[in-house]
């Protein structure tokens, strides 16, 4: 097995108890954010070009933010990010990434995690990873032939858009099943959140990729 040298670093956390539990036991509801910081610092040598973090809070009502992302460039990115986070960066799901570029591309636009927004919780998608898509030209050309016009030519962005498209299709399938079963309104949303199958998204997306992959992802409804 090869030793780790200059690969990107990733971290993924899911809290299994209510936030009040951590407040009572540890004196803070930001237990997850603290653990994420420690996990990223332990891999600091693997991310000298930038860093990013994301968080999902499953317990906020409509009208309030529930999916957060912060990114920064440079070797001090971890310190910069956590120095500007406030109490709103809190929840049950956390993800972090340390960037080491293998393509030479620079700029905050290339720093993970990547985020795809939507008003439906289940359609929100955040991705980060340590990977190189070796057939990016082929995948890009296929997207263009379907009528799409990707804004950025990078394997990370293309992966986000392809998975996001498949996630939309999966949510739409669950929506139709919910309506056909007689549900309406918020009951449809709850049905989708409970039944969306992220494995279907992965199976139908990754089959067309070549390369080496370590990927982490979050959806607004709590899939990881």
Task: Identify the function of each model-found stretch.
Residues 1-224:
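Conserved short alpha-helical segments that host acidic/polar catalytic motifs at enzyme active sites
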